[in-house]
Amino acid sequence: MNAPVQDAEARELALAGMRPRACAKEDARFIQGKGNYVDDIKMPGMLHMDIVRAPIAHGRIKKIHKDAALAMPGVHAVLTAEDLKPLKLHWMPTLAGDVAAVLADEKVHFQMQEVAIVIADDRYIAADAVEAVKVEYDELPVVIDPIDALKPDAPVLREDLAGKTSGAHGPREHHNHIFTWGAGDKAATDAVFANAPVTVSQHMYYPRVHPCPLETCGCVASFDPIKGDLTTYITSQAPHVVRTVVSMLSGIPESKVRIVSPDIGGGFGNKVGIYPGYVCAIVASIVLGRPVKWVEDRVENISTTAFARDYHMDGELAATPDGKILGLRVNVVADHGAFDACADPTKFPAGLFHICSGSYDIPRAHCSVKGVYTNKAPGGVAYRCSFRVTEAVYLIERMVDVLAQKLNMDKAEIRAKNFIRKEQFPYTTQFGFEYDSGDYHTALKKVLDAVDYPAWRAEQAARRADPNSPTLMGIGLVTFTEVVGAGPSKMCDILGVGMFDSCEIRIHPTGSAIARMGTITQGQGHQTTYAQIIATELGIPSEVIQVEEGDTSTAPYGLGTYGSRSTPVAGAAIALAARKIHAKARKIAAHMLEVNENDLDWEVDRFKVKGDDSKFKTMADIAWQAYHQPPAGLEPGLEAVHYYDPPNFTYPFGIYLCVVDIDRATGETKVRRFYALDDCGTRINPMIIEGQIHGGLTEGYAVAMGQQMPFDAQGNLLGNTLMDYFLPTAVETPHWETDHTVTPSPHHPIGAKGVAESPHVGSIPTFTAAVVDAFAHVGVTHLDMPHTSYRVWKSLKEHNLAL
């Protein structure tokens, strides 16, 4: 039956489709504590696993004594690498083409490495039994600094690779060398520098940090020895990839492997990889024939799961005396830890670091990245960014500030002078990226006008003129371009696995719908955002659209959620699947209204006959017809599947400004104002966008102002608890102001670019720029993170600015 004729605007509002500030559909159950996480899952006969970990960073295993643990009541098994060897599971491949030990075999490579597992009736017995397992070691020399690791006399860290002169990414120049990868035209860039009237250089270290999600990693593995089926509930950002890898490792057919990612308490890249704990729990379930749960504690999470950053970077810019950039040259030494486990594209072992030319029209550029083994935990994940983009943005933005300071130019002026102009898009960088769209000049002007930038500079000048001022004032300005939407399979496969994503939509006979995707939410608001896309495309109210993700037995194959790929890739798949349904629905509507398809117009939620608004059919009308009285020759039902492999990345951008006051007596830094303008293309739900931006800015503040993972010379991590590792609360978190421009992506079905990672990428160099700017009048060009009160106070003392 036809719905009553209503105003189109009212009907569009009722749909809660794209753009309204609709509340997140998933919020209610989380607010009420009704989420369902891995640690909430219980199964009959379930056992618990804990892990024996190495107390040293480098050493040979002489002997493992496990009899005392096995004698304890409630202990079912203690397994070591020797027990995994018959299953060929003591080593496993990494996503970077390396191999990593599941359980240490003969040698440990980093502190807290997995040495043995204990399976017991409960986690407390398992923990006690772990203490009862005694391991004898012969300690070996430890190498923590990747620069030292490349010295001729450095100890061999990966003896399993001894004698191998090439790796997955080319020649190995040293026994601790993984790869050297470069992009751009080196000869042409060197020639520019040789003749440039102005050059600047800067060394900077981007410290190792940890994503530190609220929920740690864990799984519940259940193998059915009768059916040969394996079901594993797991904290994974990419459940289908886990299914494929588990099948390859275990030999269990993929059709018999079910991976379920239930509610996940944050990922931020930390839950993309496959950790030894997952493999061990699966092995334990296969060996014992019972479900096995493993959930790591916070110390294990910070100490052993994938870190981010740890980049030693040297940047150079060549320019004219009036500030026009002529060339960029970058050399990096990247600490990959004990195993190369970075989830980077196979073609780009340094990730997408070559986005380091940023938002600027730079005629010549070259970058080189060297990956190195050390005695630290492996990782190098894309912590709330695309692969290595945070490091790239940090480098170019610091270098532009260094150049501005040398030329005595304003930081905003030099950026505007070198921006890629709107009419240059699509723009191909010297590194081969094709930026889809952008309008940097308009965005910069909007920010400078909104904050009254000249007034801030005037206040800063007055403050500097007063030698008795109790505070220093710094103004940081950053203009960044991100690359997201991993990503085109032709550019971005991981060991041959394409980076497409998928959607299946089914409209039920009564007009409600269910949609299943290959992504998995960890707080991004997928249930709301995805439903809004479908609501807009098909005219079905979002409240009757059910969104399901994370179960490989029902969801179409997809590559998961990371690198801001949900909306750019899965969102496109959703829109295109919906359009397949829309095309079929048009045929059915034409049949029902007895007109030609070309005689129909689509308006919000209905097809109507051109020139007669009283003749129309809604999607609910069409759905019933599709199932029960479809036109002759048309297959019954109303559903579609679409796999989307994007033709290009998407390139969101932003302009951020931060004003800080630094107490000259204590080094305490207070953020007076932070203004963040983001352009993520088409905006689907402003409320969710703002929430994601607030979260990214807060994590960026944590990284810039307090987070670090320092090691001593013996490889001990100094600060692997939340007593030491800075996570800001509401007390420390500054007030955020957000703004936007809209520059849709021309190749994306709905013009969306992605947003959740941009604020993290852009905010970190903005905080650093503000702190350094407070010292600029005494010639300081750079200060490494984190900008803790103590480190800032030391800089005040060093430059005779302390009171």
From Swiss-Prot:
Known cofactor(s): Cu(+); Mo-molybdopterin cytosine dinucleotide
Cofactor details (free text): Binds 1 Cu(+) ion per subunit.
Binding site for Cu(+): 385
One protein family per Pfam: MoCoBD_1
Entry-annotated residues carrying 4-hydroxyarginine: 384
Recorded GO MF terms: anaerobic carbon-monoxide dehydrogenase activity; carbon-monoxide oxygenase activity; copper ion binding; iron ion binding; molybdenum ion binding
E.C. number(s) listed in UniProt: 1.2.5.3
Catalysed reactions listed for this entry: CO + a quinone + H2O = a quinol + CO2
Highest taxon listed in the record's lineage: Bacteria
Binding site for Mo-molybdopterin cytosine dinucleotide: 757
Keywords noted in UniProt: Copper, Hydroxylation, Metal-binding, Molybdenum, Oxidoreductase
Gene3D superfamilies, sorted: Aldehyde oxidase/xanthine dehydrogenase, a/b hammerhead, Aldehyde oxidase/xanthine dehydrogenase, molybdopterin binding domain
InterPro entries: Ald_Oxase/Xan_DH_a/b, Ald_Oxase/Xan_DH_a/b_sf, Ald_Oxase/xanthine_DH-like, AldOxase/xan_DH_MoCoBD1, AldOxase/xan_DH_MoCoBD2, AldOxase/xan_DH_Mopterin-bd_sf, CO_Mo_DH_lsu
The protein's role, per its UniProt record: Catalyzes the oxidation of carbon monoxide to carbon dioxide.
UniProt subunit comment: Dimer of heterotrimers. Each heterotrimer consists of a large, a medium and a small subunit.
Protein name: Carbon monoxide dehydrogenase large chain
